[in-house]
Amino acid sequence: MRAGTTITWEDFLASGEDGQRWEWVDGEVEFMSPVNLRHENFLVLLIACLAQFCRAHPEWMAFASNGVFTMASGNWRMPDASLVRSVRFPEKKIPVRADFAPDVAFEILSPSDSPSQIQRKRLDYQQSEVIQVWFDLEKRLVEVIYPDRPLQYYREDDTLTIDAVPGLSIDLKDLFSI
């Protein structure tokens, strides 16, 4: 399909196969390569941290990698993990996909990610005013991109905090211990 092509939700779901992840980007279905076990284990540990945070802070909800969000561009993105303020789901009714971007998107860099794919995803998040948290497993580095201020970097000995998410505190040494 060409850029600007429209697609129904049902067509989007039928585009891939079970166990495969894909996103709708610039009018085309973009398939995502399977992740390695290290990536997957890191994601499980991250989701556990986010779930623990949400239990203590019910004003937030955490989603794993198959949650689909609509960016300002119209693209459908599936961050590795995300946080969304609960008030964005009236009466806590969670739809099949969100017609909005998450408040915070967590992404784990993969060797198969091309620089252009990463840049396009960052731009989508930026235009949608999403706080982005990018994990580089090789460099053991975390990059936090806010829509309205300079980048922040965290190393594996640091504790990740996000001003807009009071109470969130992730010990990166525990995450990077894999």
PLM segments and residue spans:
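Gly/Pro/Ser/Thr-rich low-complexity, intrinsically disordered segments predominantly at protein N-termini
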Residues: 1-178
